[in-house]
From Swiss-Prot:
Any one cellular-component term (Gene Ontology): plasma membrane
Signal sequence annotation: none
Oligomeric and partner information: Interacts with GNB5. Interacts with RGS7BP, leading to regulate the subcellular location of the heterodimer formed with GNB5. Interacts with GNAI1.
Gene Ontology biological process terms, A to Z: negative regulation of signal transduction; positive regulation of GTPase activity; positive regulation of neuron differentiation; regulation of G protein-coupled receptor signaling pathway
Name under which the protein is recorded: Regulator of G-protein signaling 6
Pfam families: RGS (PF00615)
UniProt lineage: Eukaryota, Metazoa, Chordata, Craniata, Vertebrata
Length: 66
């Protein structure tokens, strides 16, 4: 849901929300950590640097296919 909501955020809020999602779900020691394969994790960690609305697309697709 966090990723879906990110896509609807005003552009000025997107980068901040990307960082919040990263820290909550994907960063080392994240409190609500999700498990991604190494390929999806690498792509997503690179995308976080750009901070766009579609930063988590690969991760979302990977989780959906589980």
């Amino acid at each position: 849901l966090a990723v879906q909501d990110l896509k609807k955020q005003p552009l000025q809020d997107v980068a901040k929300r990307v960082e919040e999602i990263w820290q909550e779900f994907l960063a080392p020691g994240a409190p609500s950590a999700i498990n991604l394969d190494s390929h999806s994790y690498e792509i997503t960690s690179q995308n976080v640097k750009d901070g766009g609305r579609y930063t988590f697309e690969d991760a979302q697709e990977h989780i959906y296919k589980l």
